[in-house]
Amino acid sequence: MMSCLVPTRFTLTLNTACLLTSTWGFVRATSVVLPPSLSKAGHKQFLTIISIIATIINNAVNISNYYIQRNNKMNLETKKKSDFISRHVTLPVSLVLESIVATVYWPLRLFFVNLIMHGVESTAKTPFPMTVDMAIHLYPILYLLADHYLSGSGTKFKLSNKHAWLIVTSLAFSYFQYLAFLIDAGQGQAYPYPFLDVNEPYKSIIFVVVATITWAYYVFYQKFPPKYIKKSAKKGDKN
């Protein structure tokens, strides 16, 4: 029976740093006063907030896994479960979420800010400073990529592309229904991002496109796993 890959100190450092910056960014971002059209649904409607919560959970789980794998009193089954949850559930989920957040957010933030923020026509008038912007929209994906590819703890994810597609599709549909439940256009409420304030079928098409790109990120990460995993596979083929 194969033993679990013991997380490196670099993984611990990355997850601790990400936990601190993400939590700080989350607190600062959720303290921003929303305009009337968004205030009723609150900050919980934003994909950025949902993603940063997933990242914070992933950080906490991976920090715990670091110590679990080094605890001689823990049995192998507990270590295997901890490894699976931290490296093959919370990490890929937060990684693909932060990937799509960064992909959608930054091009619009830099060139079409009116499509990503309500009532903002200039990048100089955003509701929070660049430090907060980076903490919730850029640093998370950089930390997660470093943990997966550079920390020495990364492996190819165990979830198949087919199962990943089912999960991503379910999450996208759930978010679509979640927003429909929170937002009542008849009462002057608006979707969290202006580019979603369109009629059907365009709104659904946007969700399908975003969900497809999110799944494509998972496929990409599986196609190009951490390098040392590839080397190990090649050695195994020769034997």
From Swiss-Prot:
GO terms for cellular component: cytoplasm; endomembrane system; endoplasmic reticulum; endoplasmic reticulum membrane. Disulfide bonds: none annotated. The chain crosses the membrane at residues 12-31, 46-66, 100-120, 126-146, 163-183, 205-225. Residues 32-45, 121-125, 184-204 are lumenal. It is found in: Endoplasmic reticulum membrane. It is a multi-pass membrane protein. Residues 1-11, 67-99, 147-162, 226-239 are cytoplasmic. The keyword ATP-binding does not apply. InterPro entries: ADTRP_AIG1 (IPR006838). Keywords: Endoplasmic reticulum, Membrane, Transmembrane, Transmembrane helix. Pfam families: Far-17a_AIG1. Its main location: endoplasmic reticulum. Belongs to the UPF0641 family. PANTHER family: ANDROGEN-INDUCED PROTEIN 1-RELATED (PTHR10989), AT02829P-RELATED (PTHR10989:SF16). This is UPF0641 membrane protein YHR140W. It comes from Saccharomyces cerevisiae (strain ATCC 204508 / S288c) (Baker's yeast). The lineage of its organism: Eukaryota, Fungi, Dikarya, Ascomycota, Saccharomycotina.
